[in-house]
């Protein structure tokens, strides 16, 4: 494999996982904070808020997993390697 392609693939993999983790990380923090505030205001709605929170956290985490998959493809099954 060409050294430039190898180094670009490693850099792209690092950027893919890094950038894929930033957005969901911020979103999960905001969602969790809002859920805690909602439970503090309405303790009787705790079950519904928690269920909705867990579902949305799973959706947000899937974005990070997609970034991880792209990074692994670039590192181990590189389509640009020739």
UniProtKB/Swiss-Prot annotation:
SUPFAM superfamilies: F1F0 ATP synthase subunit C. GO terms for cellular component: plasma membrane-derived thylakoid membrane; proton-transporting ATP synthase complex; proton-transporting two-sector ATPase complex, proton-transporting domain. It is found in: Cellular thylakoid membrane. It is a multi-pass membrane protein. Belongs to the ATPase C chain family. InterPro entries: ATP_synth_csu_bac/chlpt, ATP_synth_F0_csu, ATP_synth_F0_csu_DDCD_BS, ATP_synth_F0_csu_sf, ATPase_proteolipid_c-like_dom, F/V-ATP_Csub_sf. F-type ATPases have 2 components, F(1) - the catalytic core - and F(0) - the membrane proton channel. F(1) has five subunits: alpha(3), beta(3), gamma(1), delta(1), epsilon(1). F(0) has four main subunits: a(1), b(1), b'(1) and c(10-14). The alpha and beta chains form an alternating ring which encloses part of the gamma chain. F(1) is attached to F(0) by a central stalk formed by the gamma and epsilon chains, while a peripheral stalk is formed by the delta, b and b' chains. Gene3D superfamilies: F1F0 ATP synthase subunit C. The record marks 61 as: Reversibly protonated during proton transport. The chain crosses the membrane at residues 5-25, 57-77. Keywords: ATP synthesis, CF(0), Hydrogen ion transport, Ion transport, Lipid-binding, Membrane, Thylakoid, Transmembrane, Transmembrane helix, Transport. One of its GO terms (molecular function) is proton-transporting ATP synthase activity, rotational mechanism. PANTHER family: ATP SYNTHASE LIPID-BINDING PROTEIN, MITOCHONDRIAL (PTHR10031), ATPASE PROTEIN 9 (PTHR10031:SF0). F(1)F(0) ATP synthase produces ATP from ADP in the presence of a proton or sodium gradient. F-type ATPases consist of two structural domains, F(1) containing the extramembraneous catalytic core and F(0) containing the membrane proton channel, linked together by a central stalk and a peripheral stalk. During catalysis, ATP synthesis in the catalytic domain of F(1) is coupled via a rotary mechanism of the central stalk subunits to proton translocation. This is ATP synthase subunit c.
């Amino acid at each position: 494999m060409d050294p430039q392609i190898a180094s670009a693939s490693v850099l792209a993999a690092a950027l893919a996982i890094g950038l894929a983790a930033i957005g969901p990380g911020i979103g999960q923090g905001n969602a969790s904070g809002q859920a805690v505030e909602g439970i503090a205001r309405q303790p009787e709605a705790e079950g519904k808020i928690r269920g909705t929170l867990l579902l949305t956290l799973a959706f947000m985490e899937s974005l990070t997993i997609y970034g991880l998959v792209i990074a692994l493809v670039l590192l181990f099954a590189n389509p640009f390697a020739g």
